[in-house]
Amino acid sequence: MKKVIVIGINHAGTSFIRTLLSKSKDFKVNAYDRNTNISFLGCGIALAVSGVVKNTDDLFYSNPEELKQMGANIFMSHDVTNIDLIKKQVTVRDLTSNKEFTDQFDQLVIASGAWPICMNVENKVTHKPLEFNYTDKYCGNVKNLISCKLYQHALTLIDSFRKDKTIKSVAIVGSGYIGLELAEAAWLCKKQVTVIDLLDKPAGNNFDHEFTDELEKVMQKDGLKLMMGCSVKGFVVDSTNNVVKGVETDKGIVNADLVIQSIGFRPSTKFVPKDQNFEFIHNGSIKVNEFLQALNHKDVYVIGGCAAIYNAASEQYENIDLATNAVKSGLVAAMHIIGSNQVKLQSIVGTNALHIFGLNLAACGLTEQRAKKLGFDVGISVVDDNDRPEFMGSYDKVRFKLVYDKKTLRILGAQLLSWNTNHSEIIFYIALAIQKQMLLTELGLVDVYFLPHYNKPFNFVLATVLQALGFSYYIPKK
């Protein structure tokens, strides 16, 4: 019986263990995780804070006992500190007793995920996975200075937003999806909200100005303060009781009773040796093939937030830390270990969506700005259209954008915004088109249906494609 060691038991690790042990009983599995719980859906933190999710326990979909019943040996509060590929063993520290031991493997699965990038009070951006422990409520033990990832963070934020009457103002550092969702949650809890980011626009890494301008307008209309293009210099801390009081920026001090850091994530791979022929990309994630094997290491699989997977849009290895990528990568790795070569994760394109302040947004592939930075000869096509024929009497506005290579007509990216009716699932088939390296001429002739209850003969996707190809007479009059 082969022995598999799994490092990390959140989305990717749980998916791997469930798949492996439901398909085969020929493996012994030892799985280690630093946390005390598994499978927490961090996407629900903002929903729990705002009161949409009533019970945070509902944000778990598995637990250690379930995996044990499947046959896995689960070790919570255990930290893997080193890997030795020659001896095929890992070094593990029991965080409860502080004792260290080694464990042998035939195959190794690295599913250690990613940890929030946090700035300390001296403004040094560091990558220390235990900068604040899983049992700690606050970053660096500074009260009301918090990050956002775990169940423990969710409980702290719920207490801060919904129970602590002294917290009236919230500053959020970072305007990515987590930062924006928490900004909306704070606003729904009647807090004064300031969002700070070095980017020029909120969600600027995922969307171009045609979409971020609209998001910015809605947020400002609702009374949120946006400090874009703003650099954080440090945090204002009351030294007498070690409580955060605000954020120091290059545009002045932002006073706040609670400060949330949502700068982003960095793969938790510091324990992976740099001298054993792993291929890392710039942020420390590890390159893998279509079966999630680490390049150069057939018995080591890397899944989830610490894997660098081939991006079909950029044609580069990229680390895109999404739960969808995590669970798929776990499934593929498990099937390959069992012996299947048919299930492959050949590429990703970063498909994502956001519902915030009444807006429905979705995107995949490259933004216009990123495509230009990568050196593509970029073409764009943007269309504002109604989703149904006007003769239906009721219809909603949709904005759709395609980014493509003018030389080859290859589709590089897409972005979508709707104000009322949600059309975000359209992005799925654009993601597939990018993964399959489709051209505009092919996308424009996809066999789609027409039914006036739902769409137009030339729906907003086809209209955008046709505009890019020069068929402007198909474009709705503005």
From Swiss-Prot:
NAD(+) binds at residues 170-185, 197, 264, 353. One of its GO terms (molecular function) is NADH dehydrogenase (ubiquinone) activity. Binds 1 FAD per subunit. Gene3D superfamilies: 3.30.390.30, FAD/NAD(P)-binding domain. Keywords: FAD, Flavoprotein, NAD, Oxidation, Oxidoreductase, Redox-active center. Disruption phenotype: Probably essential, it was not disrupted in a global transposon mutagenesis study. It is an enzyme of class 1 (oxidoreductase). The modification Cysteine sulfinic acid (-SO2H) is found at residue 43. FAD binds at residues 8-12, 33, 43, 80, 111-114, 149, 177, 295-305, 322-324, 450. Its EC number is 1.6.3.4. The keyword tRNA processing does not apply. The active site is at 11 (proton acceptor), 43 (redox-active). Pfam families: Pyr_redox_2, Pyr_redox_dim. Its cofactor is FAD. Catalyzes the four-electron reduction of molecular oxygen to water. PANTHER family: NAD(P)H SULFUR OXIDOREDUCTASE (COA-DEPENDENT), PYRIDINE NUCLEOTIDE-DISULFIDE OXIDOREDUCTASE DOMAIN-CONTAINING. Belongs to the class-III pyridine nucleotide-disulfide oxidoreductase family. This is NADH oxidase. It comes from Mycoplasma genitalium (strain ATCC 33530 / DSM 19775 / NCTC 10195 / G37) (Mycoplasmoides genitalium). The gene is nox.
